[in-house]
Curated annotation (Swiss-Prot):
The keyword Acetylation applies. Its EC number is 1.1.1.37, 1.1.1.96. Pfam families: Ldh_1_C, Ldh_1_N. One of its GO terms (biological process) is NADP metabolic process. SUPFAM superfamilies: LDH C-terminal domain-like, NAD(P)-binding Rossmann-fold domains. It catalyses: (S)-malate + NAD(+) = oxaloacetate + NADH + H(+); (2R)-2-hydroxy-3-(4-hydroxyphenyl)propanoate + NAD(+) = 3-(4-hydroxyphenyl)pyruvate + NADH + H(+); (S)-2-hydroxyglutarate + NAD(+) = 2-oxoglutarate + NADH + H(+). This is Malate dehydrogenase, cytoplasmic.
Length: 334
């Protein structure tokens, strides 16, 4: 058995964490021979609920779970971390402007970035899930200057999985038969789900999704809006936001960081845009197609970008630049 790794989940008393913690504890994310010390952080009023989650994790009797620590203190939570999964954020309330949401979360992620800087290992991998995820991730990254920027990523894998699922449903295949969809940009309704480089396995052969579907108007219209608005559709139907699917996407994202991506496949994640080959301005936290090897991501190069894609990619970059500007105004005045 290897040495235990310390994994933090914030917002640990919440819905997404409840669907996520078992998968981390049972070896589905870091492997079946990797012991884990699981650290659960939430705000003080949630500590009663968190105690219940702690009891349940103990009652799972998971052999890989060497210890579970529930806390509301950042110095305890962020100490010596190998992985930080930042799920907790201020949720959007009725009548709340996106700007107000940004303001509340900038404060949270500035503090958490500073705590990572102060207490965590410099090699820590940080995954931001709490919305607005891209800008929250950028804020945390800026607040932890001695941790490499490349160690920060935000979750767009849920959008990626949603796009795969829509294509699979349309073609009557399983999601596993679809690969190399791309989510460009922000984890918001401006994101651009792009299947112009995606492949699907049909009758034992790999074909391009556009060739397989022969329905350009659906792919350039309804498909994109369905993926963009899927989160809202789940809330409308379930009266709660996506939790099971979000937790599964977090597992996929973190597992790929840990073990790498399969040969010939790429995945989507929000990463720092510096030096990217697709004309996205530097210093944004933007979702790109990446391959991962030795726990290090690399943006997939050489993909042709048509005018349709260019326009959509620029639109979501513009939104991210505006979010960043708003967030950093708050940061400098905080």
């Amino acid at each position: 058995m290897s040495e235990p790794i310390r994994v933090l989940v914030t917002g640990a008393a919440g819905q997404i964490a409840y669907s996520l913690l078992y998968s981390i504890g049972n070896g589905s994310v870091f492997g079946k021979d990797q012991p884990i010390i699981l650290v659960l952080l939430d705000i003080t009023p949630m500590m009663g609920v968190l105690d219940g989650v702690l009891m349940e994790l103990q009652d799972c009797a998971l052999p890989l779970l060497k210890d579970v620590i529930a806390t509301d203190k950042e110095d305890v939570a962020f100490k010596d971390l190998d992985v930080a999964i930042l799920v907790g954020s201020m949720p959007r309330r009725d009548g709340m402007e996106r700007k107000d949401l940004l303001k509340a979360n900038v404060k949270i992620f500035k503090c958490q970035g500073a705590a990572l800087e102060k207490y965590a290992k410099k090699s820590v991998k940080v995954i931001v899930v709490g919305n607005p995820a891209n800008t929250n991730c950028l804020t945390a990254c800026k607040s932890a200057p001695s941790i490499p920027k490349e160690n920060f990523s935000c979750l767009t894998r849920l959008d990626h999985n949603r796009a795969k699922a829509q294509i699979a449903l349309k073609l009557g295949v399983t999601s596993d038969d679809v690969k190399n969809v791309i989510i460009w940009g922000n984890h918001s309704s401006t994101q651009y789900p792009d299947v112009s480089h995606a492949k699907v396995k049909l009758h034992g052969k790999e074909v391009g999704v556009y060739d397989a579907l022969k329905d350009d108007s659906w792919l350039k219209g309804e498909f994109i809006t369905t993926v963009q608005q899927r989160g809202a559709a789940v809330i409308k139907a379930r009266k709660l936001s996506s939790a099971m699917s979000a937790a599964k996407a977090i597992c996929d994202h973190v597992r790929d960081i840990w073990f790498g991506t399969p040969e010939g496949e790429f995945v989507s994640m929000g990463i720092i845009s510096d030096g990217n080959p697709y004309g996205v301005p530097d210093d944004l936290l933007y979702s790109f197609p990446v391959t991962i090897k030795n726990k290090t991501w690399k943006v997939v190069e050489g993909l042709t970008i048509n005018d349709f894609s260019r326009e959509k990619m620029d639109l979501t970059a513009k939104e991210l630049a505006e979010e960043k500007e708003t967030a950093f105004e708050f940061l400098s005045s905080a």
